[in-house]
Amino acid sequence: MALNIRKTHPLLKIVNQTLIDLPAPSNISVWWNFGSLLGLCLIIQIVTGLFLAMHYTADISLAFSSVVHICRDVNYGWLIRNIHANGASLFFVCIYFHIARGLYYGSYLYKETWNIGVILLFLLMATAFVGYVLPWGQMSFWGATVITNLLSAFPYVGDVLVQWIWGGFSVDNATLTRFFAFHFLLPFLITALMIIHVLFLHETGSNNPMGLNSDMDKISFHPYFSYKDALGFLTLLILLGVLALFLPNLLGEAENFIPANPLVTPPHIKPEWYFLFAYAILRSIPNKLGGVLALLFSILILMLVPFLHTSKQRSSTFRPLTQIFFWTLVTNMLILTWIGGQPVEQPFILIGQIASISYFSLFLIALPLAGWWENKILNLN
């Protein structure tokens, strides 16, 4: 019998073990689609970003005009820009669903995979932030000024750190140039880390909705999950098409259609919608350094989750109390997102502070206590 080339060729063998003959649990649901959707989002963003970079000029006197030029004069430039801008939003939708799936089904117990995932989230947020500055509109400029200025809260080194990032004494040409360099570079770093993320996942195999060992019931990735992923791809592409073609500015900020003016501050400085929850946590603390640390810990807390797991069961499927707290956390995130887009006045300040305390309390107190109590009532200890 002739040897199968996909199982013997050094390169094809890797592809085969990752995408074709990979043993996958037979009961993984649609929530396991988001990993591959994130891969698709990354490819879309790199391809559209590359074409945008061919026509973009990273100079404060030309950046805004070059984006206008892309939309008006470049063949399908408007479409490429709309796909890139809305693709970023869908990227965050997918990553938040992906993280929520991991929290609900206990996937965080694969510690290496989970921690690399958290680093990937940080890198994605950094990429989106520096990318938002590039069109050099009002919100680009003032968003960059406000967020980078937060680093000045760190004692002793703060002011030097801010000037080092700015490349001067204010957000200026040097800042835009380096942000463009970072925005071009970081997606490739994300790609490398994504490969390591998948590598670590395949050391253990996928988790499943029941949180049980599925070694006795595995099926091959192709054709079962390759077709299932293809359906997910189609859904995502339709959604992206609808957004880019019919509602391209739905998730954007109208203020960013005004060229950056250092002399005029916008009435409400706020980031893109996918950062609003973290921005609300930042604003809920009156102290500058405290706010910055809360902002950092709002993401870093995900790294603590594996160590706060007290339940004898992995998944939340059969744990009603944990489910209640999980959905409370989801609702809390939505409230924080809403508050992040509101002006700093009552009652929004108080709601934001309550939601911020709830956010950390759910992770650090409620969920570990729920796991411990469920062990007690089920006599699992």
Curated annotation (Swiss-Prot):
Q: How does it sit in the membrane?
A: Multi-pass membrane protein
Query: Entry's SUPFAM superfamilies?
Result: a domain/subunit of cytochrome bc1 complex (Ubiquinol-cytochrome c reductase), Transmembrane di-heme cytochromes
Q: Tell me the residue numbers annotated for binding heme b b566.
A: 98, 197
Where, in this chain's numbering, is a ubiquinone bound? 202
- Lineage: superkingdom: Eukaryota
| Iron as UniProt keyword | yes
Q: Which UniProt keywords apply?
A: Electron transport, Heme, Iron, Membrane, Metal-binding, Mitochondrion, Mitochondrion inner membrane, Respiratory chain, Transmembrane, Transmembrane helix, Transport, Ubiquinone
Instruction: List, alphabetically, the CDD domains matched.
Output: cytochrome_b_C, Cytochrome_b_N
Q: Which cofactor does it need?
A: heme b
Chief location? mitochondrion
What's the record's note on cofactor binding? Binds 2 heme b groups non-covalently.
Leftover remarks: Heme 1 (or BL or b562) is low-potential and absorbs at about 562 nm, and heme 2 (or BH or b566) is high-potential and absorbs at about 566 nm.
Q: Subunit structure of this entry?
A: The cytochrome bc1 complex contains 3 respiratory subunits (MT-CYB, CYC1 and UQCRFS1), 2 core proteins (UQCRC1 and UQCRC2) and probably 6 low-molecular weight proteins.
Described by its record, this protein's role is as follows:
Component of the ubiquinol-cytochrome c reductase complex (complex III or cytochrome b-c1 complex) that is part of the mitochondrial respiratory chain. The b-c1 complex mediates electron transfer from ubiquinol to cytochrome c. Contributes to the generation of a proton gradient across the mitochondrial membrane that is then used for ATP synthesis.
Name of the featured protein = Cytochrome b
